[in-house]
From Swiss-Prot:
This is Anthranilate phosphoribosyltransferase. Catalyzes the transfer of the phosphoribosyl group of 5-phosphorylribose-1-pyrophosphate (PRPP) to anthranilate to yield N-(5'-phosphoribosyl)-anthranilate (PRA). One of its GO terms (molecular function) is anthranilate phosphoribosyltransferase activity. The lineage of its organism: Bacteria, Pseudomonadati, Pseudomonadota, Alphaproteobacteria, Rhodobacterales. Belongs to the anthranilate phosphoribosyltransferase family.
């Protein structure tokens, strides 16, 4: 163990760390050179003062540098949320990923098990016969052959094991609760990313800009969800050409109706999988409209659609033509063969 982190903990409590200082601090953490007390001290100093964009970018850059990387085709994007919104909705970002892939955009989706939901993305994919616990080689095969791959965080970020026990003991949100969407192992340059609070969308968008993203939408629903909501207004921080612009979006902007929140509440993994299969079959529902809205946004970010209405049409075609279902079946086959 090293004492190099001690002065940085004190500095972090008093003032924002420079990007170089933050990179040094997180390198020490990820190299396993900090004690549990030092890790907790740094994380709580940052949380209490409030993390800066430079600190987010530094932590994410170090985490990316130490990950088990994936080579993704040009133009691949991520569709992901921070999780932690506590709303227990149906699996919207996961379904969106398959619909967007069915529309011809390669999706390199990064995620983890969602401890705040009855059924996270890993649970839904398991119900659909997809093995999420695969390494970079299998993910690369899936991206190239199926046009979609899922990267489970523990399989790609082994260095975070050094901080997990302390995070569990702290039992509160820290910088690590937002690092997942900022540390895609495939290094994608385009993202549709949900945040559990509106306050994070601009700083996360600015962080992705510092990390080299070309275009990204950071979103939060007015109902508290970490995605574009079908129940009313959503807030968006849109990164494009190095600048961030904040806008409000409404389902009607995409030609979609508003639905009550109760219509998108999820259940057990089995119940959510049943809803997902019905969506793939083309059944009309609030769930379908929520997925169409988010898929439309992703297709705009990917430059596949000029606006949300065109994106909705492309997303609906992906579902109704069977292309979205074909992506589920292809990913299941490739990942099961890897067992």
């Amino acid at each position: 163990m090293s004492d190099a982190l001690k002065p940085l903990i004190g500095a972090a409590a008093d003032r924002p760390l420079t990007r170089a200082e933050a990179e040094q601090a997180f390198t020490i953490l990820f190299d396993g050179e900090a004690t549990p007390s030092q890790i907790g001290g740094l994380l709580m100093a940052l949380r209490t003062r409030g993390e800066t964009v430079d600190e987010y970018a530094a932590a994410a850059a170090v985490m990316r540098a130490k990950c088990n990387a994936v080579r993704a085709p040009e133009g691949a994007m991520d569709i992901v949320g921070t999780g932690g919104d506590g709303k227990n909705t149906l699996n919207i970002s996961t379904a969106t990923a398959f619909v967007v892939a069915g529309a011809g955009v390669v999706v390199a989706k990064h995620g983890n098990r969602n401890l705040s939901s009855k059924s996270g993305t890993a649970d839904l994919q398991g119900q659909m016969g997809i093995n999420v616990m695969v390494g970079p080689q299998v993910v690369e095969k899936a991206l190239n052959e199926a046009g979609i791959g899922f990267m489970m965080a523990p399989m790609h970020h082994p260095a975070t094991a050094h901080v997990m026990p302390t995070r569990a003991e702290l039992g509160t949100r820290t910088i690590f609760n937002i690092l997942g969407p900022l540390t895609n192992p495939a290094g994608v340059k385009r993202q549709l990313t949900g945040a559990f609070t509106r306050a994070l969308i601009r700083p996360m968008a600015e962080t992705l800009g510092l990390l080299g993203s070309e275009r990204a939408w950071l979103v939060h629903g007015s109902d508290g969800t970490d995605e574009l909501t079908i129940t009313g207004v959503s807030w968006v921080a849109a990164l494009e050409d190095g600048t961030v612009k904040e806008v409000e979006l409404h389902p009607e902007d995409a030609g979609l109706p508003v639905h009550p929140f109760e219509a998108i509440i999820g259940g057990t993994p089995e119940e959510n999988a049943t809803a997902f299969r019905a969506l793939l079959d083309g059944a009309p529902s609030a769930y379908r409209d929520a997925v169409l809205l988010n898929a439309a946004a992703a297709l705009v970010v990917a430059d596949r659609a000029a606006d949300l209405r065109e994106g909705v049409a492309l997303a609906a075609q992906s579902i109704d033509s069977g292309q979205a279902r074909a992506k589920v079946e292809a990913l299941s086959r490739i990942t099961q063969d890897a067992r």
